[in-house]
Amino acid sequence: MAASGSGMAQKTWELANNMQEAQSIDEIYKYDKKQQQEILAAKPWTKDHHYFKYCKISALALLKMVMHARSGGNLEVMGLMLGKVDGETMIIMDSFALPVEGTETRVNAQAAAYEYMAAYIENAKQVGRLENAIGWYHSHPGYGCWLSGIDVSTQMLNQQFQEPFVAVVIDPTRTISAGKVNLGAFRTYPKGYKPPDEGPSEYQTIPLNKIEDFGVHCKQYYALEVSYFKSSLDRKLLELLWNKYWVNTLSSSSLLTNADYTTGQVFDLSEKLEQSEAQLGRGSFMLGLETHDRKSEDKLAKATRDSCKTTIEAIHGLMSQVIKDKLFNQINIS
């Protein structure tokens, strides 16, 4: 019973995150030093600022990052990722946490973190992990996957001195609420570069107190298409992890775990609706301001989408509880 429950929980997680199995362990873990040196020497990303388009993350690296992000609660956490480059794809093989000071709005790396980083990478090479640092990750608890002004500055600095480098952002709170990993991978454009107009990206809810920071910097970076993979080795390690944690999947409830987050979402939504109502009210007394009206209606439409998203997540959490109650609590005695 325990084995079947563990396997079902693991399969559900893999399907929700579109986990793909690598064709061969050797294919994905083989490190060609000569090929990597040739790529570093050619530096194709300097000729095309949109060169890297894809980001592949191993299942084990993904789990380590999500578990680290979740352990931070409402505080931001930070870590480093090891990997390699294959054409236009950045492959993240492993990740590790950094001993940094975190707040609810930023993470601050001190000298000890940089010493730890250098020692970890050096020790990894001694045990046969030849991949170099390929990026950094940090968490945005409850406010989505995007780069703030500080994040953009940090990533620009990294790309200037440590190319190739990618920034990954994880929202552990929304991951629990939606049941799917909420993660984004980003690269910044050089200063002064104006990117071509792109189509609308996937909509995500941004809290009112973060909208300004999001809007000011959203044109300074672009998102990579993220996918996940697992090898036979990953599968064995995942089975060991799931044997330990699968019970938590059944015993926990997103309605209880994320009660504060849901309350915050409703409060944020009420502020957005009040702001939209005030703008629409002012617009009714001002003639000839069609642009103003359109902006107000656009804000109202976004607030409506946020409301639908919060409602759907709450319904999913409630349905999950009802199903578990039917399965485990209502035993028919014949």
From Swiss-Prot:
PANTHER family: EUKARYOTIC TRANSLATION INITIATION FACTOR 3 -RELATED. Its EC number is 3.4.-.-. Its cofactor is a divalent metal cation. The keyword Protease applies. The keyword Transferase does not apply. Probable protease subunit of the COP9 signalosome complex (CSN), a complex involved in various cellular and developmental processes. The CSN complex is an essential regulator of the ubiquitin (Ubl) conjugation pathway by mediating the deneddylation of the cullin subunits of the SCF-type E3 ligase complexes, leading to decrease the Ubl ligase activity of SCF-type complexes such as SCF, CSA or DDB2. The complex is also involved in phosphorylation of p53/TP53, c-jun/JUN, IkappaBalpha/NFKBIA, ITPK1 and IRF8, possibly via its association with CK2 and PKD kinases. The JAMM motif is essential for the protease activity of the CSN complex resulting in deneddylation of cullins. It constitutes the catalytic center of the complex. It comes from Homo sapiens (Human). GO terms for molecular function: deNEDDylase activity; enzyme binding; macrophage migration inhibitory factor binding; metal ion binding; metal-dependent deubiquitinase activity; metallopeptidase activity; transcription coactivator activity; translation initiation factor activity. Coiled coil: none annotated. The modification N-acetylalanine is found at residue 2. Zn(2+) binds at residues 138, 140, 151. GO terms for cellular component: chromatin; COP9 signalosome; cytoplasm; cytosol; eukaryotic translation initiation factor 3 complex; nucleoplasm; nucleus; perinuclear region of cytoplasm. A motif (JAMM motif) lies at residues 138-151. It is found in: Cytoplasm, Cytosol; Nucleus; Cytoplasm, Perinuclear region; Cytoplasmic vesicle, Secretory vesicle, Synaptic vesicle. Its main location: cytoplasm. Component of the CSN complex, composed of COPS1/GPS1, COPS2, COPS3, COPS4, COPS5, COPS6, COPS7 (COPS7A or COPS7B), COPS8 and COPS9 isoform 1. In the complex, it probably interacts directly with COPS1, COPS2, COPS4, COPS6 and COPS7 (COPS7A or COPS7B) and COPS9 isoform 1. Interacts with COPS9 isoform 2. The CSN complex interacts with the BRISC complex. Also exists as monomeric form. Interacts with TP53, MIF, JUN, UCHL1, NCOA1, HIF1A, CDKN1B, BCL3, GFER, PGR, LHCGR, SMAD4, SMAD7, ID1, ID3, ITGB2 and TOP2A. Part of a complex consisting of RANBP9, Ran, DYRK1B and COPS5. Interacts with IFIT3. Keywords: Acetylation, Cytoplasm, Cytoplasmic vesicle, Hydrolase, Metal-binding, Metalloprotease, Nucleus, Protease, Signalosome, Synapse, Zinc. Residues 55-192 form the MPN domain. It comes from the Eukaryota. Belongs to the peptidase M67A family. CSN5 subfamily. This is COP9 signalosome complex subunit 5. One of its GO terms (biological process) is translation. Gene3D superfamilies: Cytidine Deaminase, domain 2.
